[in-house]
Amino acid sequence: MRRRAFLRGVGAAAGTATAAALGGRASTRRVAAHPGPYEPYGSIDVAGAKEAVVGPDGDVAYLATTTGYATVDVSVPDRPELLADVRDPLADRDGGPLRVIFDAKLDVADPTTLVVAGPANPRRGAISGILVVDVSDPARPVEVAFHATDFPVHNCFVRDGLAYLTGNDGGRNPIVILDVETGAEVGRWSVADVADAWAAVPSGLRSVHDVYVADDTAFVALWDAGTWLLDVSDPAEPTLRGRVDVPDPEPLAELPESAVRRRATLPPGNHHYVATDESGTLLGVGRESWGRRVADDATETPAANVAANDSGASGPAAPLSAAPDAEFVGGPSGIDLWDVSDPAAPVPLSTVPAPATPDPTYGGVWTTAHNFELSGGVLYSSWYRGGVKRHDVSDPAAPTEASWWRDPDAASFWTARLAAPGEREGFFVASSMGVGDGPAGLYAFPDHAGEQADPSGVLPSGTATPRPRYGTGTAGGSDATTRPGADGGISAPGFGVAAGAGGVALAAWRLLRRAEE
């Protein structure tokens, strides 16, 4: 039974009052449902939208909104409605409010508990930690606790009353496990504890960007240090269970800082987001990367460019074109699928490539992989201005694209999350941080195959050449170059390990710290 009537009955007045008191930032647009061309069912503007998750009944979406958090009723997907829009939480505390909020997660085992994390990046003098919110009535969220940390919290995962936090401190960069009720630290793990060779790698190359927990296994995305699988059956003592696409640490340890900066945005590496399907045996690894113009490649990555990476701002609307004779190093990466049924011996299955882009540089048109969900044999994925996609991954060795929607002039998608499965009435939601001065918000899309009737012609057709994983590139010390082809896509052979020695997340934070000092 859909809950729209219930939500209206118990919380519509509160939701309206909250929205009005906090700026009335939401406005709804309607579109026609299927049959017909593939397009959104509906969307709603929510300022600052970043990560989104959906409750288990598929009726409510919960958003991190940069300056707060919000709940949206999506039970009628062509008419999403704002329930609550909370801005500047903890404003009454020293160092408050909690800011730069990019992540919010429901407890998988107790979806009445929402954890709001921040700041995503260091802010001098600002509070940092997790805000625990009771969302048993999503129209009337109640803040029940705040647990402070001595590190920024870029991302988190919550399961069984435990919050798994990205503990980037510029040193060991651990995963930190907290008790959601008490705030007590339960355990922690760092790749620097695995071997001295990893401790010698610059922290910017082994920043912990995200974490996902399935049953008693935590999957930790460590940027250029690959993805690590931990046994957390005893969360007080996480132990190593396996590793995915992990390079030799010694070449990374030998890179000078100038090389780290130069390669901060380039593949391979760049493990950004990880998630499994319901079985816990099919793992998706999203790799976030960009390219560099060959003409600029001899120069160091500008500090301002790197520091902007995790700002979360939509930024200016980069021109949707590049010089026709431009050559590039690197490019956007996709989502790798792995069989992890034996965690000690993961098997690569396939790569879902990124949409093609006319300009793969950091200042260009982003189409690299961002957050996603694997559910019911379908991969729901977001690609910034490259749009959202659905792939049939019932045979994960041969993914098939089933639908793709994009509007690169208006939407830059942060995540895609299943709300209700099924071709007839199913749908998924996707949050967009907007483009330029355009609004951010939440979209609802049909959960069926289809083709967009009139996609914007500014993006090339097809996909970018899949970026190599570690150990899959060609031998030799030179980087391959790419040139937009006839269809505007990026084509390039793979490169070796040295081409991907970046660590954009923590490199950005280090530069931000320097700028603030």
Residue ranges and their predicted role:
Residues M1-E517:
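Hydrophobic alpha-helical segments
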